[in-house]
Design a protein with these regions (language model features):
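Walker A/P-loop
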Residues: 1-7
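Conserved AAA+ ATPase "sensor/coupling" helix adjacent to the nucleotide-binding pocket
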Residues: 118-128
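Loop/turn-to-beta-strand initiation segments
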Residues: 9-11, 41-48, 75-82, 104
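A short beta-strand-to-loop transition that corresponds to the Sensor-1 phosphate-sensing loop
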Residues: 50-53, 82-88, 111-112
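Conserved ATPase-coupling elements of RecA-like P-loop NTPase cores
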Residues: 22-29, 43, 55-66, 91-94
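Short regulatory helix/loop adjacent to the ATP-binding pocket of P-loop NTPases
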Residues: 2, 61-63, 87-102, 120
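Short glycine-rich substrate-engagement loop in P-loop NTPases that contacts/grips substrate
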Residues: 10-41
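A short helix-turn-beta junction within AAA+ P-loop NTPase domains corresponding to the substrate/partner-engaging
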Residues: 70-74, 93-109
Length: 128
């Protein structure tokens, strides 16, 4: 069951490994990221899902992606759900305080259907 406040939203999965890994030069990475961020900023009823969120601040070009997302996240133009392991969160995400403060940490033991609904309800006030 989808909460009423989320019924008009689309969820898009972004594959960071493909986005960053297929580029040849740093400038090419930045161009792809800039294009994606501009596209996401125009889609106000879209939530992006990024698995392996730690890659935003860990891989070549990743820091550029994290920095480019920050303004859109602050203004509410970009809405994001990220997933990573506790170890990777502590090793990478916690080091970037400016990126970290734009998120609410939710620990999930196993993502069954009732848990997913609870997570979405927990993020609902931030999306309204």
């Amino acid at each position: 069951m989808v909460p009423d406040a989320l019924k008009n939203y689309s969820l898009i999965k972004i594959n960071i490994t493909s986005l960053i890994g297929e580029t040849v030069s740093e400038g090419n990475v930045e161009n792809r990221i800039d294009l994606l961020v501009r596209e996401l900023s125009d889609r106000l009823n879209t939530i992006i899902f990024i698995d392996e969120t730690h890659l935003l601040v860990n891989k070549a070009g990743g820091m550029d992606f994290a920095n480019m997302l920050k303004a859109g996240l602050d203004r509410g133009q970009i809405k994001m759900i990220g997933a990573t392991t506790t170890e990777e969160y502590e090793q990478y995400i916690l080091r970037d305080r400016a990126f970290l403060r734009r998120f609410q940490k939710i620990d999930v033991l196993e993502a069954d259907k009732p848990t997913v609904v609870k997570i979405l309800m927990g993020t609902l006030p931030k999306l309204e």
